Amino acid sequence: MKKDALLYPLRNTHNTDDTPALWNWAQNSVVGQRQQLHQPRNEAELQQLLRDSHGKVRVLGSRLSPGRMLCVQPQDVLLDLSALRGILAQDEESVTFAAGTPLQQVYDSLTKMDRMLASSPGVIAVQTLAGALATGTHGQGLAQSSLADEALHIRMVLADGSVREFQRGDADFPAAMVSLGALGIVTAITLRTQPFRLFTCHKFAASADSLEQDLLTWNEQHELSKAWWFVDDNLMHVWNADVASAEDSQAWYDHQREVIEHGDQADSSLNDTIDQTLEHMHRDTQIHGKGGKQFRTVTRFRDFTDISGDIYQLFCRGIAVPQINVEIGVPLAKTPEIISKIKAWYAQNRPHMHYPIILRCTGASQAWMSPAHQQPTCFFGFVVYYADDGSLSQDGLHFLTEVEKLLAAEGGRPHWGKYYDPQRYQWRAIYPQWDAFRAVREQLDPTHRFSNDYVTALFD
């Protein structure tokens, strides 16, 4: 089998709801059989299941990750923790959620309490809370880091059914923060919260000529910053957000807590670039003329305007469409040099650009296995959407391969819940606490019950 087919598998476009095989969300990988799936109703049932069963154990979460992270052998166990959801406890500064709570429910619950997390959200919120922590899910902004960095307490059921409580400050807490599901089954997470705030997001288009300096400036001067790099046109679309003024905040409340759009005239300066991007995407994805949700991810950049709202309304606006998503975090200090190298490589090779490059920067993470561990980080994100026949643009995949090669050579660390080529990385060299994490794993799961082929290849 070709390497591309292993890294970027084709998609099954048929309905799989009634099949014996259980697929991941993108339907590009069978993770096991439905008869292997267990759905404990509470922690006690989970403990008993672990005591009574044999074989390896993996948690499915929302099944958004590549299949290799989830898949098990016929004798193994798959867990669905969707029954473990909702608020378990709260005090003035924190809220404890069950591990299977979807992020959208977490965000909605906090908003109703007039609270929020210090970490800004990613673009979608269908992930489970525990799954988002385990894979290092993050948003944008140098004053914050991953979702896992807001955890104060993590409750975990171990392979023998016993319970281990991790508290912030414990020597091994940084291992539990981003664990890849390799230590135990998380059942509850306490998140620190802060008072609810509103933001105004200023959107604009700019040349990418000085992106090397501009990206750092945007992130240093604004609480939250996100950018899309349309390399073909040498253009940027930028969202910079800061705390909303009293006037904008009042307008939001007067508008029934809905997003406020500012300005009578929308900015159309990106429209030609958007049309060109849509042409590329249409050629790459419309084999039979079906589907089309992927187009909405860029049509929203047409006729843009500044907006005000809560942090989730502004940034958690993604459209979940099956895709190959590669995201590599590099040291922020090296980012200007890396941008220059991408520009030079593009000028020399003129690769096919399926989608703009997404740029999000975060502060350093305390989690040993976070791609942002110990260093402010710029995440370069790349997307190739599946065609309606389940195929992928070969030119788009070639670009993914080459740009990952470039970023890996610069000390890049891949997002665990997305696609990457493991052969490109020397894990010990890029993760200072790699062996410390392995030692915690040996202590908590000496028989490696929470492993599969993917986890074994990583750590053994």
Name each model-derived stretch.
Residues 1-460:
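Noncatalytic alpha-helical scaffold of FAD-dependent oxidoreductases
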